[in-house]
Amino acid sequence: MEVPKKILYVSGSIGLGHVTRDLAIAGQLRKQYPEVELSWLASHPATIPLKEAGEKLLPQADMYANDSVPAENAARGFGMNILKYASKTRREWAHNVKIFRQIISKGKFDVVIGDETYEIGISLSMKLVRLKVPFVMIYDFFGLDSVTENPIEKLGVYTWNWIWAKTDRKLLSGQKNLALFAGEPEDVPDTGLGFFLPNRRDHAKTYYKFTGYILPFDPAQYADKTRFMSQGG
């Protein structure tokens, strides 16, 4: 099988957790396939560690909308209402899809990787964006839960879960695209997604490939517990 040489890597979602594992994935890609060329698309603050690592950021990254802003607006204390975040970020998602469409229409890539880039996955499944090369989506959870008894929130959660399951079916039923789940099957609740919707874990096992945990360090370095504890004082 021919190894893809030019990869567009879109580090999505919020905060720095995703880009940390994305850099770990990029390191392993280069280790196994030294000829790989990575071009990155991300927004602040994910652009900071990417620049520090010397990665190639596309110029369009300066215009890529920041998902962290609507996330902060949806947060209360130490928690965040995911549904409220999803509703607040629609404008940013539409903007990012427009930029993504411009990039793939001009750039020649062999594969596109998206780390929780829901806006791209949905737009591809709805054929709002045409992508001729394979698309790889990375998840670390599946399905939303309502955090209150508000019927509007419950309906919104159900609608989002329906869209998510439908997107997976459309995007992942063939041999072209792939979804990776950063974790184990047990990390997906063995519960229903909603009325007439699939069981979460069964759905994940059907459509996702589980990678185990992606770590930005080598666990073997910490195998000697006594030495590790002594170094920590």
What are these regions (language model features)?
Residues 4-5, 9-11, 32, 36-87:
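Conserved nucleotide-sugar phosphate-binding/catalytic loop shared by glycosyltransferases and other
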Residues 6, 110-111, 178:
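Structural motif
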Residues 11-23:
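A short, glycine/small-residue-rich beta-strand->loop->alpha-helix junction that serves as a flexible
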Residues 37-43, 139, 179-184:
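Short internal beta-strands
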Residues 46-49, 112-130:
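An aromatic- and histidine-rich active-site surface loop
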Residues 74-120:
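Conserved nucleotide-sugar donor-binding subdomain of glycosyltransferases
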Residues 128-146:
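Active-site proximal beta-strand in glycosyltransferases
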Residues 147, 155-233:
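A nucleotide-sugar donor-handling region in carbohydrate enzymes
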